[in-house]
């Protein structure tokens, strides 16, 4: 398995599970494989790999069926900044998505919740109120997840202005 990266390429380290080996023998694959689509899905048939020795001789084995791989959703991060305003609500408009694949873009909407309303750096944001939608550059929301990502907001101090008057003496 590997995380979504907008390509159909599967690298040898992405294939990690083998069944039917004898005793404690292990195998690996060599080369670079490919799948029919770059999008998130399970059990893609992979072409282009050959069996390679591990702690077992690959010449003692044949591939029975297909080599398969899963492409899992890419984990999105979010960063943003705004002035302290007495609220923990965080508008999508102050946040930017990070860890997008290639030149893909997504549309972010909704409202998140900051861990605090006061000034501070790297304030954690609960993203349950946000949603993503398909964007430009081939960005499909179904290829991404917020789960496991870092979602932070820098809250700057609000400017305070002091004015006064005094009587002429």
In which residue ranges do the predicted regions lie?
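Short loop/turn motifs that initiate or flank beta-strands
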Residues: 1-168
